[in-house]
Amino acid sequence: MDIFLTNNLTNKKEKFIPQNEGNIGMYVCGPTVYDDPHIGNARPIVVFDILFKILKSKFSSVTYVRNITDVDDKIIKSSQERKISISNLTESVIKSFHEDCNFLNCESPSREPKATDHISEMINMILKLKKNGYAYESNKHVYFEVKKFKDYGQLSNKKLEELIAGSRIEVSDNKKNTEDFVLWKPSNENEPSWDSPWGKGRPGWHLECSAMSKKFLGNEFDIHGGGIDLIFPHHENEIAQSRCANDSKIFAKYWIHNAFITMSNEKMAKSQGNILKIKDFRNKISGQVIRLALLSAHYKQPLDWNDKLISECQNTLNKWYRIYDKKIKSVDVTKEVLKPLYEDLNTPGYISNLHQLFDKANKGEGKELFISACKFIGLLNEDNEKWEKYKKDKALISEVEINKRIDLRNNARANKDYKEADRIRDELFDKGVLIEDKDGK
């Protein structure tokens, strides 16, 4: 059975044909560790964990590289605001990130390089870009000269002029052209810095991923992934500098991007002030519920995060756990069941198959296949006792939201809208919150 993926480089769904079937290479942009990850950050973690599983189900060797950006302007700013050292900040956030990955039941990537461990590779790439005529030095900075790369904008499917007009590009007197991006820049006092031919400084963000992917996957590899917000400028710049430094016709063959998570149809982002940190869910709910919620929509479609979604996923897993038995031996998941995942990671289609398998298993037919199919995408990974503990002890709604609902219910009762009051009471009960009325209040 063939794997099909939507390739944003061609804007087509294509059959996945690896460069070398004996060793599949996939690079995914990981976290910039300036703050604990939020639910929006969780989506690529889970989406590409699923793709990793799919690739391993078909190919004997898959190398999955997910980097950690531990040198960046955001990290410097965050450490200054918190009045802690950069190393203490990055170590703390990396630890939290790994705990979040475990909570979401994600496999570890094959490699997880940190940017600060690969500065020499970055310097060598800059030297190669200068030698090839694509980079220039200016006032201790080194820039990539975008207009010299004729395919710039291919991933975004836009002309250079359109990209410049529609984005916030750093303005600097050091640049030859507005669109040029930094490969190396000098560091201020008390900022991270490394010796280089251009003086003490640090690499540009885009360069970091190009250097690390080259080290672990070579000049050309199969899949590059990340969030849709990385298409421009990050991934566009990666392609430009990698192809020009490596003298290659391609960088990555397939470019896969997941859409945003929204709240009230607005992108979830730190800049929006509407984030929900993953760690805040750890003691309230099973990571399986979050994982199922993240898989409930196709990765290319926006996913609106709300209490109803979480409640539905909780109820689904409650139902599935009724027939779960950890003693049952696993079996191979059939091609028919796996087919939606092979068709561009169609997780809603796969979940639909799980519901059908459950209905059969609930009647005593194919329980082994149902449980194995759930485990394939990282579900039913806790025993019944632990699941029951979560269900019994943990509310699925924040205290702030509980108080809001109680106020709404009190208003409904005051207006003698008892139907609405009962609906809110039942909704809270489904989320693990029991309301008892005493003395008519």
Model segments located where?
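Alpha-helical recognition segments enriched in aromatics with Gly/Pro capping
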Residues: M1-Y34, D49, E99, S120-K329
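Short, well-structured beta-strand/strand-turn elements
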Residues: S61-T63, G133-N139, A361, L434-E436
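Short, glycine/charge-rich beta-strand/loop segments that flank catalytic centers
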Residues: I68-D72, V93-F97, E107-M122, N139-F149
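Surface-exposed helix-capping loop/turn segments at secondary-structure junctions
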Residues: K58-S61, F103-S110, A135, E220, ...
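Short, polar/flexible loop-turn hinges at active-site or ligand-entry regions and domain interfaces
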Residues: R82-N88, P109, K300-D304
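N-terminal, positively charged nucleic-acid-binding surface of large information/translation enzymes
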Residues: T10-K13, Q19-N105, I435-E436
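Structural preference for alpha-helix termini/caps and helix-kink/transition segments
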Residues: K267-K441
